[in-house]
Amino acid sequence: MKIGLVIADNMEFEPVVEKCKLYGGESYYICGDRAVSFETICGNKIVAILCGTGKVNAAGATAALICKERPDCILNIGLSGAIKGVYKNDIVIGEKFLEHDFDLTPLGYEVGVKPQPKYIFEPDEELFNRFTSKFSKIKPCVFVTGDMFVSSTEKKEFIINKWGGGCCDMESAAVASVCYKMEMPFLSLRKLSDDADESAAGTYRESNNLKEDVLINMIISLFG
C-alpha cells in the first residue's frame, strides 16, 4: 500500500524526514515542492510532500502528489487550533471538512456556502474506522479551514455559532476537495497546538518548535 502525506509546515515535516532517514528512503521534489518517500518494515510505502501553508498550496501539492505517485490514499497531518469540545494537545480526526472563510454573502449565499453540489467533505470511512479503532484516544470533530491563523475569541465564537467546528486549520478542506474530485480516499489527523484565541500565536510556536513525531508514529504503527 502507498500512503500519501500532505504536510504544510517545515517543523511538521521534519519528523517525517527523520523517519525517511531511519528507513533509508529518498528525498526529491514534486512540482517544486520538497518530498520524501520510504518503505516501512511491512513493505508499505509512505510518500510525503511539504505543501506550504494555506489552501492554494495544499490543493496544488495534493493534486501533484496524486498525479506523480498514484497513492492509495491521502492523509493530511499537522497542527491545528482547538475550537470547541477539544483541547490543546488532543489528537483529533476530521469527520467533516469545510471552509470558514469562503464568502459570497453579497450574492445572497451564507458564509461558507459554495454554489456547487458538494462543498462539505467527509473522510474515507474505512480509513476513519481503522484509525479510531486502533487509537481510542483520538477525538473526531469538524475541521474548519481558512487562509488565516485564528487567534481571536471573536472569530472562534463565530466559527462555533456557525458550524460548531471542533478545530481550525489552513489546509484540510482544500486537500479534501481535491481528493473528492480525484476519487482519492482521504483523511486528516491533527494534533492541537493552541486554543485559537489571543494566546494562540505563542502556544502554537511552542508546539511547532517541538517537531513532535506522534502523528507519523501513529501512521507507521497502523500501516506497519
Place the predicted regions along the sequence by residue.
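Active-site-proximal beta-strand elements of phosphoester/diester hydrolases
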Residues: 46-52, 142-144, 189
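Alpha-helix C-terminal capping segments
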Residues: 64-68, 84-86, 177-185
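N-terminal short beta-loop-beta anion/metal-coordinating cradle
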Residues: 1-63
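Proline-aspartate-enriched helix->loop->beta-strand connector
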Residues: 70-75
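His/Asp/Glu-rich mid-to-C-terminal helical/loop segments that flank catalytic regions of hydrolases
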Residues: 196-224
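Mid-sequence, gly/pro-rich, charge-dense loop/helix-turn segments that line enzyme active sites
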Residues: 80-163
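A C-terminal functional module that forms or caps the active site or interfaces directly
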Residues: 149-201
